Amino acid sequence: MAGGAREVLTLQLGHFAGFVGAHWWNQQDAALGRATDAKESPGELCPDVLYRTGRTLHGQDTYTPRLILMDLKGSLSSLKEEGGLYRDKQLDAAIAWQGKLTTHKEELCPKNPYLQDFLSAEGVLSSDGVWRVKSIPNGKGSPPLTTATTPKPLIPTEASIRVWSDFLRVHLHPRSICMIQKYNHDGEAGRLEAFGQGESVLKEPKYQEELEDRLHFYVEECDYLQGFQILCDLHDGFSGVGAKAAELLQDEYSGRGIITWGLLPGPYHRGEAQRNIYRLLNTAFGLVHLAAHSSLVCPLSLGGSLGLRPEPPVNFPYLHYDATLPFHCSAILATALDTVTVPYRLCSSPVSMVHLADMLSFCGKKVVTAGATIPFPLAPGQSLPDSLMQFGGATPWTPLSACGEPSGTRCFAQSVVLRGIDRACHTSQLTPGTPPPSSLHACTTGEEVLAQYLQQQQPRVMSSSHLLLTPYRVAPPYPHLFSSCSPQGMVLDGSPKGAAVESIPVFGALCSSSSLHQTLEALARDLTKLDLRRWASFMDAGVEHDDVAELLQELQSLAQCYHAGDSLVD
């Protein structure tokens, strides 16, 4: 591992986590492809934090995500469980048995046309069955193969996206994908629906040993492992898988950071009674158990509520999305996730996962909220102070943790990242002798502007801030969500003309907020209203009545940590 990177191992648990993860890894891949571009700011984010180098049996250098993902039978579509990068037909044919063989061949899923286009651009399958990669970004691996013309890439349509692998542009290591064969992705029967089912999966020796083997494979090759990030579905049985996985990590790798992102797709409807009750129970059990075994937990959702009462999805002024499409929702959440995780992925002066968690989780506040402004509204000719002053005293970001509007709530500690603003716009370019319209316009660096803005907004709050030149890439397969934006994500008057949006500035934050007091108490109130006798199927999956009583008590204790009077300063 070059450069002493502080490695992170990612766990993706669940199908919606797969959607968010696919956008996340596509973003990392897009950043790698731009690393040698003379126009780009070099070296702000270290890809080795998330990626590992390797080599196939045929001597091909590889650069793949340091990733373990778990999903259900039937969820991969045309993606093979072992991936496509290391495949070797000669090895597949090496069978020890010399007797008579009967072959049962399963019909292959048709590959998404978008991925066919991607694979033809990335490499070729030779006649001997070996995948030959054309190039590996960022100088990793052999020189690129060139062609006379570069075909324009296909853009996936919403109708063509059924599962997350339909738009994943990144090759995975054979040790990345772990399928839970006892439960089905499709159909009404054999579903992983309840927290107890998920916990029991990792209590089975087969799955527990498989996860441990993969963990040891990745961890043992790390020089400076800083920790683990878990992307975990909260709404279904994967909340139990995530809780058990976090417990295993805490037991085996004490002292390492464990940051868990609890993911919830949206929206939901009153008419789906059983699904809504299960979602409530899974979310409550997941949050409490994940908080017990993680350094930090952050729910991520575009919904307005974690409880039983449906609330409309959140709104972004310059972004139009369909809340019923996981492809859209996951893209937005991945944008926020890639931004708020910047501190522990920096090349220079990174903040470790443990330090970030310690700063935000004092006094037992291990659950935090997320928010983001996507895109950050900078118009042509404006400076950063101009744009920040437009927010006035309002919270600048849209809430992404289903905890309601942050207005009127109290922030105890926050980590803020602003990315993608050109250096020339960081400070106000006033004509000499012109009095500055605000104290922000008098600042001499962008970092000073951001720090002073946060101090003015939350004068008694512990704040950490980072300002990056690196924007967020929104090239295909990222969906077309932006209106009235230039190719670089600047806000324009009227309809945009010309090229599509390629990158955007993003303002993201993690916050320990008093809004969690109301949210967690509301969860507990909704649980007390349930007649558990009506939901025996959830209880039969491995949850006792005493477990629910204990859950209520722990939810209320956790909620009390966020009472507005509990702060570092008064």
Summary of predicted features, one role per range:
Residues 2-570:
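Terminal, contiguous helix-loop blocks that mediate binding/assembly
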